[in-house]
Amino acid sequence: MKIENGEKLLFIGDSVTDDNRARPVGEGNNAALGNGFVRLIDAYLAAEYPERNIHVVNMGVSGNTSRDLVERWESDVTAQNPDWVVLCIGFNDVWRQFDTPCIPQRAVPLDEYRKNLNSLADATRAKTIWMTPYYLEPNETDA
């Protein structure tokens, strides 16, 4: 595994990352990390690599777009001095075109999304894992 002993792994993104994390910083164990994939990854790392003492932090904010991340990157990422950053963003960049079509300035067009991701990459000193929006196909057996 590439994550070394005692390293800090910071997750940042939108509601997919946030998932009801503690404020102002989601860290520690269990509920403080939220109820989603960050908590699951922390539990996995603790179970499989307990000797590594990996410090997991959740800085996700529901409703955020890549534009919001650019604005809060310094305070929520750089100031935390992580060794690794896991970024999951883009759902709301697209969704704002549909949930508030009468307010087009809330949407983040693809060219701005790319520009924002490049800006975040340039501002990041830590090793980075990028997650972009993914498509979930509905389960045909769901009611």
Segment roles from a protein language model:
Residues 2-32:
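Short glycine-rich His-centered loop
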Residues 2-5, 40-55, 64-143:
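Alpha-helical cap/lid subdomain in secreted, periplasmic
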Residues 11-12, 58, 130:
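A structural signal for the hydrophobic beta-strands that form the central parallel beta-sheet
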Residues 15, 26, 37, 142-143:
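Contiguous hydrophobic segments
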Residues 25-26, 55-57:
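Glycine-/proline-rich flexible loop or hinge segments
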Residues 26-48:
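Short catalytic helix/loop segments, enriched in acidic residues and glycine
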Residues 61:
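Conserved active-site regions of diverse hydrolases
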